[in-house]
Swiss-Prot record:
It comes from Human papillomavirus type 6a. InterPro entries: Helicase_SF3_DNA-vir (IPR014015), P-loop_NTPase (IPR027417), PPV_DNA_helicase_E1_C (IPR001177), PPV_DNA_helicase_E1_N (IPR014000), PPV_E1_DBD (IPR046832), PPV_E1_DBD_sf (IPR046935), Rep_E1_papillomaV (IPR016393), Znf_lg_T-Ag_D1_dom_sf (IPR037102). This is Replication protein E1. The modification Phosphoserine is found at residues 89, 93, 107. There is a cross-link at residue 559 (Glycyl lysine isopeptide (Lys-Gly) (interchain with G-Cter in SUMO)). GO terms for molecular function: ATP binding; ATP hydrolysis activity; DNA binding; DNA helicase activity.
Amino acid sequence: MADDSGTENEGSGCTGWFMVEAIVQHPTGTQISDDEDEEVEDSGYDMVDFIDDSNITHNSLEAQALFNRQEADTHYATVQDLKRKYLGSPYVSPINTIAEAVESEISPRLDAIKLTRQPKKVKRRLFQTRELTDSGYGYSEVEAGTGTQVEKHGVPENGGDGQEKDTGRDIEGEEHTEAEAPTNSVREHAGTAGILELLKCKDLRAALLGKFKECFGLSFIDLIRPFKSDKTTCADWVVAGFGIHHSISEAFQKLIEPLSLYAHIQWLTNAWGMVLLVLVRFKVNKSRSTVARTLATLLNIPDNQMLIEPPKIQSGVAALYWFRTGISNASTVIGEAPEWITRQTVIEHGLADSQFKLTEMVQWAYDNDICEESEIAFEYAQRGDFDSNARAFLNSNMQAKYVKDCATMCRHYKHAEMRKMSIKQWIKHRGSKIEGTGNWKPIVQFLRHQNIEFIPFLSKFKLWLHGTPKKNCIAIVGPPDTGKSYFCMSLISFLGGTVISHVNSSSHFWLQPLVDAKVALLDDATQPCWIYMDTYMRNLLDGNPMSIDRKHKALTLIKCPPLLVTSNIDITKEEKYKYLHTRVTTFTFPNPFPFDRNGNAVYELSNANWKCFFERLSSSLDIQDSEDEEDGSNSQAFRCVPGTVVRTL
């Protein structure tokens, strides 16, 4: 068996394990440092204070908090210095006073220190403000439910935002006025930044209206009448512009002058910049969209920063405002004042508009030969700009009654005038209303085209024109498209006659238009129409007096005016109409009406040509003027307006 390790000669001497300790002070060749004390032994007492194992007391905890707070104050002051260096002075809300704005621009910290605190929670306000957080990032958005609200952003009562909670900074009792942090570039003016942020609110129009009232002291609605459509044109416009650069205000007068006939310009300066109010009358009518594009170019602002509406021309208060501000040094006026301002501010114009005279309206309708109610109302309303009686008519609450009365009276005068005239005077009266001389030859050429001898036609036409009994009716018959209706309609148009139709024969009043006519036309008589005339209208065709039933009026006795009839039926070839053969003079148009290659009528039967026809053949038709009338009519023009007597002193 092998020997145990570490044993030799078991049984003699020491046996088993033993510990050998060797101390090596310096290896061979090691140099010993001169400043090292080789003889001093390290006892370990110099490492006692490396770790503080003593109990933590309350005073040491306060020291740590004080140190942290001092560090936070130092960091906060450094950040504020950077903000003031790169962001500029903060801008306060427009709802504050000017003194507060100036104070805030000097020092935002000074503005935050106040003896009287503003309430932290405010009610809904018209304007919206942007605020800058302590960290300098982003915007603090304002939420609004149905309208635009303003919140006074300050430090919450729980000690501040997240950053301030970490630093432990106590800012209770201090409010910070915050400003917008531009992302692209630094704003040139704090006021420009404020107006741009204001225009981002939800109800832009309400914000602009509120700012206008704050600047000018009156509502913008009091000066304008709103147009719903942007395409409606008008010559006069009221424009309010916001956020305009001050350099444009100096040149705006020269820029607007070439485009306008009148301009009333007012400039005001507020914390946002320049605000413009202008009343302008352009040389041509413009729509709102056109005005917006024009002024946006001149003022160098977007069109959503402008309020554009036409002025309230019927308001005396609005006219007085423009008049009073126009004569003050607060406005610049170019051109002559509009007539609607002068009319409502000059005393004599105001007195002239106070009373409406129906006689002047009737005289105007009579002179212009207007008897339709709708036409009277429309045309007379357009005279309101220069006619005092028309302005009084527009201001009246009885316009419908006045229009109806005017049309009724005008028809009465016209009817009485017509019945008073002979056919000779009537033809001359109708010819005096037609301009131009015309040519009578196309009428004669058309009759020859229809194989009608002109001399026999002229003799029968003269008897018809004067309403000779048994010769009071002329019938133009023939195939379709031969020009029968064209020939008769042109003649009736010149003579100012009326047209009746058998389609209304079921009514007792279908012949009522004959009462107020000088001549008449029955177009396209069919078989039932001829039968009706043969049965009931023989006396009327004779040209003798007969009674006519009128609606809502008693029967009236009249002599039938000269009557023209067009038809495709030749009654001279019908034996059953033998009683009409002697009462109706018949002419046949057998040939189609000719047209040129462009579709125009070869024979023009215009009013001017008929005028020349009657003037040329007046002696043959027995309608020539007498010797007393050759020098002109000595009758006085009709006048329904009472005259005035000029009394001499």
